[in-house]
Amino acid sequence: MASAPAEAETRQRLLRTVKKEVKQIMEEAVTRKFVHEDSSHIISFCAAVEACVLHGLRRRAAGFLRSNKIAALFMKVGKNFPPAEDLSRKVQDLEQLIESARNQIQGLQENVRKLPKLPNLSPLAIKHLWIRTALFEKVLDKIVHYLVENSSKYYEKEALLMDPVDGPILASLLVGPCALEYTKMKTADHFWTDPSADELVQRHRIHSSHVRQDSPTKRPALCIQKRHSSGSMDDRPSLSARDYVESLHQNSRATLLYGKNNVLVQPRDDMEAVPGYLSLHQTADVMTLKWTPNQLMNGSVGDLDYEKSVYWDYAMTIRLEEIVYLHCHQQVDSGGTVVLVSQDGIQRPPFRFPKGGHLLQFLSCLENGLLPHGQLDPPLWSQRGKGKVFPKLRKRSPQGSAESTSSDKDDDEATDYVFRIIYPGMQSEFVAPDFLGSTSSVSVGPAWMMVPAGRSMLVVARGSQWEPARWDTTLPTPSPKEQPPMPQDLMDVSVSNLPSLWQPSPRKSSCSSCSQSGSADGSSTNGCNHERAPLKLLCDNMKYQILSRAFYGWLAYCRHLSTVRTHLSALVNHMIVSPDLPCDAGQGLTARIWEQYLHDSTSYEEQELLRLIYYGGIQPEIRKAVWPFLLGHYQFGMTETERKEVDEQIHACYAQTMAEWLGCEAIVRQRERESHAAALAKCSSGASLDSHLHRMLHRDSTISNESSQSCSSGRQNIRLHSDSSSSTQVFESVDEVEQVEAEGRLEEKQPKIPNGNLVNGTCSPDSGHPSSHNFSSGLSEHSEPSLSTEDSVLDAQRNTPTVLRPRDGSVDDRQSSEATTSQDEAPREELAVQDSLESDLLANESMDEFMSITGSLDMALPEKDDVVMEGWRSSETEKHGQADSEDNLSEEPEMESLFPALASLAVTTSANEVSPVSSSGVTYSPELLDLYTVNLHRIEKDVQRCDRNYWYFTPANLEKLRNIMCSYIWQHIEIGYVQGMCDLLAPLLVILDDEALAFSCFTELMKRMNQNFPHGGAMDTHFANMRSLIQILDSELFELMHQNGDYTHFYFCYRWFLLDFKRELVYDDVFLVWETIWAAKHVSSAHYVLFIALALVEVYRDIILENNMDFTDIIKFFNEMAERHNTKQVLKLARDLVYKVQTLIENK
């Protein structure tokens, strides 16, 4: 009897094993979100738990004669514990089902297919069936806990479950695995090979080249007159091309044991050897050898269907359970050849391995894969230092005469071998068929006996009926003289003792009633005894079936046309525009055609230009000139003078809009600074504000790094700096303060604009904000203001607009914003109180005074517009001189701007409402300020992450993007900014490269796109139309989507419709798709985006169908495929789909 320490060590070892297996299962559950029933971790876990439960089990509890001790134990526990009783009943039913199916399969019964679906269990799973089922039924922890509580009844004193500590620990360890959900779904291998979109496309590209279906008259794949016989391989791989390609990849169901490329096979005698990929795969049930030509693996087959089909004919799939012999021929100058011989005597084409020991490596992998149930006979030898080597055996002829070979030859000498695949645990005797009508028994001789060349001995199971006509074409019937002598050690064995893998399936009768009433031993009669059905009845049945199919096809077509008329007629223009009339539109709109049109607008009609764009796109060099026409900024037929007038109006409108939101933004920034200052003031307890500010000045605060504002007049400079000092500069670093002092000294040398230049100057100079009236005087006297943000850029981090300075004698915008005077010595407390009083006073100004201000400003606008336009046109020539400011911007961009603040519009809702006042005297309601603040933060966040990897979006151009977006949102504040709007603006800005022009075109574009955002209702309409299109044009795909859930919501299309496919394509493709969409409105369909979306789905429809994708899978697939689509192919297919719908409507 083992000592106590040894028993304790055994218990700890068993417990550690269970802990390790539990940890692996729980990690798998967390990592993969599920645990599959066939997971190897479950097998290991069941084995570990079973070892613990059986440790120290009493013989009486296990049963004296029972081989399955776990079953005996659980059945005894079931007498007193209901969960164990239920488990016993379920497992016994399952065992009975498995045993019954196994017996019927061994008996070769025809009605085996009528059995209930047998669970696909591996031998190890069957071995641990009781523990495994208890785990899946979530009662294992309860049963073990019961055993722990009643351990004295079932276990010896040294047992693990008898231990007062280890026993409860084991029971508690099982609670976690029993709480998990286990699945049988196909997603079992997603952890192994959850294929990416790349791999799915590649697999589809390989097997999609197989387009021709098998036909009865096609040439056999290997040019061997091979007939269907028991145990033989099909003429072609039984799997479809897709399944064949899928099986080449590693997954949890099939393990790749061996793979080698450039293995030569000669499919036909009249052709050269073809290189291909040889792979050995093992599943729980079968081992398979596959060979695929390199042309299919590389996707390099020709475009001809015949060529594609021929290569698929060459591909081979061989089940090794059908192979008996492996003939290995070694050549000194090559790597060796393997010839496989199957049970029915058919010799497979030789596999020629390249040099380098690949033949031996293949045999080694094959032998390892056969274990533990099978092996090679003779086995490979293991040699120290070399690993597996060929065996050194004396070969004999079939008659037993020894050949002149010795076992001590040099290892490098080329030697031929014949290996047999055997299963040691089973008797492998066969019965030879009697070709002349008599039955003789024969056993297979020694494995290393050579079979004479040109002859294969056929061994089959007794009890099977063979069709003589088939054998006549396969093997010549030997005469009695030619028959090989039978070995003496004949044995007559029962067919039930044969290995199940080698038992041939009997020939099936063509009569269903005969096949159902087949004999129990699998034999059947040579023909059908029933009377033949009259030929007329057969013809009548065929006629009725043809008529029925034609009628239901016609009925389905009528229903489809009804759906087309109801749902799809409004999606397309009914007039079909040809791509070839009056000329081929494949080249699109070229620069030559466009120049001719601009010179003479009557040379081309608008519809003809749109037709060219729809079928061929726009030449990239002229997109900047053509896009404003497509988007409605210009009208086709406008003269150059008319276009200039439109540009001037747009520039003036854009400048005025910018001035409005810049004034509002100034107040927003000021409010934020004041709120920060107020929060800091509350933090000071007992100390004076001065001392507190003094301390804060020396902190490198990151709360805000906004610059203070200044005004052009001397007094406003003083007041503004005082305000800024009391509210903003407490957040600035010491370096910034020093910079402010230096810039203030520089500004003292600059000319100041007197207060007398104010236009109808009723604005309080003490408001603490710059006045737009000062801007007006500056623009009148100095005619070089620039609207280009190349000069001063609004950035998302520094958002304080400042006063525009005259160009001649002006200072840097940072200097103007930070300017101060040395006479600013007023105490900050007094200034803060005074500003508060002035703000209250200004808030109560009457509406009449406000209207008088804006009325005067409107009168001055025409004078300013000329100046504004001159400054805008000069911005392009000035931008090259701003290199220094752009460099500074890239490091720490400022938020000040040199845009002219023109007259602002009245935006307040009530004269008596307390509202902040801008520098121009315009009042803003608190609701408006809050709304703009929210949108401003959203815009800044999106602008900073808009296509950062695209070359165009430098910090300066991002500022242009921000300016345009803020201007648009200011005009549509009731809608506000929604994520994605920047994506729609970005391509316009890239092409047009002009703020005002891009602003106008974006406004036109948003008239259509606004409805796709949440505040519109177009998205649901798109989904419904998409559903109708797929239902009509691709019923198979529609059925899949109907099967996989809520098919009425095509959410995977949401981003496509929201952004016009902007995130699905690269920029060059976005340009092409967008201009096609805009032209399609007038040529084919105002809903062309639907057909592009359908085309995208159709391009990958086979992949979607093959992988049975649900909406989550489709979204994931298209996200991974973003910016990698063949856009020209998609657009061509979209045009074809439009034409198809137009034709359906036309023929209704």
Swiss-Prot record:
Composition bias type Polar residues, residue spans: 702-716, 757-802
Chief subcellular location: Golgi
Domain of life: Eukaryota
SMART domains documented for this protein: RUN, TBC
Region: Disordered, residue numbers: 377-411, 700-830, 871-894
Gene Ontology cellular component terms for the protein in this record: cytoplasm; cytoplasmic vesicle membrane; cytosol; Golgi apparatus
Membrane topology, as annotated: Peripheral membrane protein
Compositional bias (Basic residues): 385-397
Subunit structure, interactors included: Interacts with RAB9A (GTP-bound form) and RAB9B (GTP-bound form); has much lower affinity for GDP-bound RAB9A and RAB9B. Interacts with RAB3A, RAB4A, RAB5A, RAB8A, RAB11A, RAP1A, RAP1B, RAP2A and RAP2B. No interaction with RAB27A.
Function per UniProt: Interacts with numerous Rab family members, functioning as Rab effector for some, and as GTPase activator for others. Promotes GTP hydrolysis by RAB34 and RAB36. Probably functions as a GTPase effector with RAB9A and RAB9B; does not stimulate GTP hydrolysis with RAB9A and RAB9B.
Protein name: Small G protein signaling modulator 1
Classification of source organism: Eukaryota, Metazoa, Chordata, Craniata, Vertebrata
Name of the gene this protein is made from: SGSM1
